[in-house]
Amino acid sequence: MKPGIHPTYAEITATCTCGNIIKVNSTAGKSLHLDVCGACHPFYTGTQKVVDTGGRIDKFNKRFGILGKK
């Protein structure tokens, strides 16, 4: 590796709105503020909401459901 051309790594803190603090190495050199992290993201915590698309599915089946039946 050539000396003097690589960026320096510094340990920074990434702080989430839930209060979770993550320490990472970065070349940016400043702390980060995160909106969501793995500790509070709805997918990982199991609190995700199911979007009601029943009307769309019924409309699709009414329109194209006959084509799939044999």
From Swiss-Prot:
| One GO CC annotation | ribonucleoprotein complex
Its BP terms in the Gene Ontology are:
translation
Q: Which InterPro entries match?
A: Ribosomal_bL28/bL31-like_sf, Ribosomal_bL31, Ribosomal_bL31_A, Ribosomal_bL31_sf
For this chain's record, the cofactor binding note is:
Binds 1 zinc ion per subunit.
Q: Which Gene3D superfamilies match?
A: Ribosomal protein L31
Cofactors required:
Zn(2+)
Complex and partners: Part of the 50S ribosomal subunit.
Protein name per the record: Large ribosomal subunit protein bL31
Gene name, Swiss-Prot/TrEMBL: rpmE
